[in-house]
Amino acid sequence: MVDAGGVENITQLPQELPQMMAAAADGLGSIAIDTTQLNMSVTDPTAWATAMNNLGMVPVGLPGQQLVSDSICVPGFDPSLNMMTGITPINPMIPGLGLVPPPPPTEVAVVKEIIHCKSCTLFPQNPNLPPPSTRERPPGCKTVFVGGLPENATEEIIQEVFEQCGDITAIRKSKKNFCHIRFAEEFMVDKAIYLSGYRMRLGSSTDKKDSGRLHVDFAQARDDFYEWECKQRMRAREERHRRKLEEDRLRPPSPPAIMHYSEHEAALLAEKLKDDSKFSEAITVLLSWIERGEVNRRSANQFYSMVQSANSHVRRLMNEKATHEQEMEEAKENFKNALTGILTQFEQIVAVFNASTRQKAWDHFSKAQRKNIDIWRKHSEELRNAQSEQLMGIRREEEMEMSDDENCDSPTKKMRVDESALAAQAYALKEENDSLRWQLDAYRNEVELLKQEKEQLFRTEENLTKDQQLQFLQQTMQGMQQQLLTIQEELNNKKSELEQAKEEQSHTQALLKVLQEQLKGTKELVETNGHSHEDSNEINVLTVALVNQDRENNIEKRSQGLKSEKEALLIGIISTFLHVHPFGANIEYLWSYMQQLDSKISANEIEMLLMRLPRMFKQEFTGVGATLEKRWKLCAFEGIKTT
């Protein structure tokens, strides 16, 4: 029989749910619930399946009839396993496993099939339509809401359809074509949700009251939430118990119990106090007995003998301390000697680098090799200085220890000095040796400073020579650039002269053709008039005059006379300057002289002016290679003679 009143509190749950959640959060683990009242066990397979379903895990091996395939629905639990296959134990107290419900399962695209029952048939929805929506799953949900039922559907038909999903504990049907179904376990709800979207038809009837589209969704129920809270508390108790067992297992063992005082135990303890290997254990027992108040008149002599045995270990401990101090001093001395040897080798390496940077060897290295040597030298000097500072610090510490020993008035020191005079002499020699070492280090530092100053002076001289060479090379490059510019200008002038000569040639050829035609005409006239000889002479004279006139015009065009009175003044000054310098002067010399008279004039203007007057000034080149120099000379007197 199905209990129809098992889910009567479903609609009342939303009002009381916040109070229940707060009580569960505040009292989780502190509320003691008897497991007999819950009717569940740790080894119960259904309880384990429900717990794993709450955690979002998939149980395996559900026996009985299966509504859909295992890939779609959550499978059940195998009672013969008593544990979840392939799943390690999970801590339910970790974040996300408290009162927060697990995330909804991911949807899988599945082709649903027609389900045939005795009283009805379920037809799947169109696979192209989106899957039916569901609300957020409440924690510990075992109850589902089923809507869209046919009007003629009865509780027996509903039970026939949904009992394939699992054991049903209660069904509550409403008059408005919906009902609430409560299952025995939580994973059965997932199988019921699978039927959402199916169209239900009773028998073979086509009546509207005998068909309806099912909508299955999660429902909130007070009983489900209460059982879920109980399970959470049970898991919390199990986790606390497991954690306590783990802490007890990892806790360090307790110290061994100290036996009670007796004369026999006191005799054994006295023997242990005399043994060096068992002294630590025995002294602990002796301390405990004294603190307990075991000392009385009867046991005072025994305790005194044990305290005397403990005191006898003081001498042994002092001897061990002296041995360890001696070993430490030897280790310090070995370290200091090794550090001194390392510092000596550093000095030699730095000396090699300094010798390599001298002029005799330095000039033979390439630029990259010089750079590497300089880097290595700086690195070696830094390491050498660091090692030297470390050694000096060790010596300062030794001197401070010596001064402390001198100021100390310990009786052991006095006894040592009184016992042997040789120790005092050795101490004096050691002080003298240290002072000599200090002086030697000071001399070395002075030598290093002098070397560094010398290297700095040497580098400054090298830098000066390099700067001078660089300036000379820059001047040479500027001269070469200026020569290149002048050569380009001369080339342009030659090209213009060549074009002018071509124009003159074409012009003279045209004149010759005209004169030849005139000559032919005059010959015809001479034949008629008889004055051929005289007229031909006149024509030749006319031709020569025209050619000479054309040449003079071309020379005037080429020379391009002076444009202004300032240019004439400049030509006069330059002519006077070059007349005083018969071997010529370069353009820089001319420009420096002219700039004293006119600060606005440039060297390019002077050079262009000289190039425009080739009969007055000429250009000559002197020197070879880097010493090549261009000079201007005055040739006006020679030009007058040639004309």
UniProtKB/Swiss-Prot annotation:
Name of the protein: Ecto-NOX disulfide-thiol exchanger 1
A single GO cellular-component term on record: plasma membrane
Lineage, uppermost ranks: Eukaryota, Metazoa, Chordata, Craniata, Vertebrata
Keywords: Biological rhythms, Cell membrane, Coiled coil, Copper, Electron transport, Membrane, NAD, Oxidoreductase, Secreted, Transport
GO function term, MF aspect, one: NADH dehydrogenase activity
InterPro entries referenced in this protein's UniProt entry, alphabetically: ENOX, ENOX1/2_dom, ENOX_RRM, Nucleotide-bd_a/b_plait_sf, RBD_domain_sf, RRM_dom
Chief subcellular location: membrane
SMART domains referenced in this protein's UniProt entry, alphabetically: RRM
Function: Probably acts as a terminal oxidase of plasma electron transport from cytosolic NAD(P)H via hydroquinones to acceptors at the cell surface. Hydroquinone oxidase activity alternates with a protein disulfide-thiol interchange/oxidoreductase activity which may control physical membrane displacements associated with vesicle budding or cell enlargement. The activities oscillate with a period length of 24 minutes and play a role in control of the ultradian cellular biological clock.
Gene: ENOX1
